[in-house]
Swiss-Prot record:
Protein's UniProt name: Phosphoheptose isomerase
Species name: Geobacter metallireducens (strain ATCC 53774 / DSM 7210 / GS-15)
Molecular function as annotated in GO: carbohydrate derivative binding; D-sedoheptulose 7-phosphate isomerase activity; zinc ion binding
Cofactor(s) listed in the protein's UniProt record: Zn(2+)
Catalytic activity: 2 D-sedoheptulose 7-phosphate = D-glycero-alpha-D-manno-heptose 7-phosphate + D-glycero-beta-D-manno-heptose 7-phosphate
GO biological process: carbohydrate metabolic process; D-glycero-D-manno-heptose 7-phosphate biosynthetic process
Classification via InterPro entries: GmhA/DiaA, Phosphoheptose_Isoase, SIS_dom, SIS_dom_sf, SIS_GmhA/DiaA_subfam
Binding locations of Zn(2+): 58, 62, 169, 177
Amino acid sequence: MNEEIMTQLRSHREVMEAVERELTPRIAAFAGMLVAALKGGKKLLVMGNGGSAADAQHFAAEIVGRFKMERRGLPAVALTTDTSILTAIGNDYGFDAVFRRQVEALADEGDVVVGLSTSGSSRNVYDALALANDRGCITVGLLGRDGGTLKDIVDLDVTVPSGDTPRIQEGHITIIHIVCDLVEKGLFK
């Protein structure tokens, strides 16, 4: 059992080292885009499925509530949290529309719309990001593997260089925490 634990921790460390080596400029760009948008009175919309839905909710909570700094709340919405909206849209239009319909209702030009997908190929995230692009939003993909179909439609892809879903999710939450820290410092220091 100890060997398996050490193997998992080594794997985590290797992915985090690759994130540092390969994604630092993209993470900085992501944070810069979000700071500029929030300074301009825009908001963050964020979505994903399964574990990525939980990460989307976590991201929005850190932006609306606080990350480390006592400060005013900032506008962010996780499109994954309202069960009435999700089930109504899913029932009436199908699961592929659950995020797209919310982007249609909530996204304004200049908002930052983030899709999380460990595969990079979630259809409902793709459709929502495509609409966000049409509406003049800034689109970011927190992705995994090779970035899938999403990397080609977002303004900025931040693709964790791993094919292992747990490691990708760990990369995503680390990136989210770094971005939250940079947003607070960029807006309030």
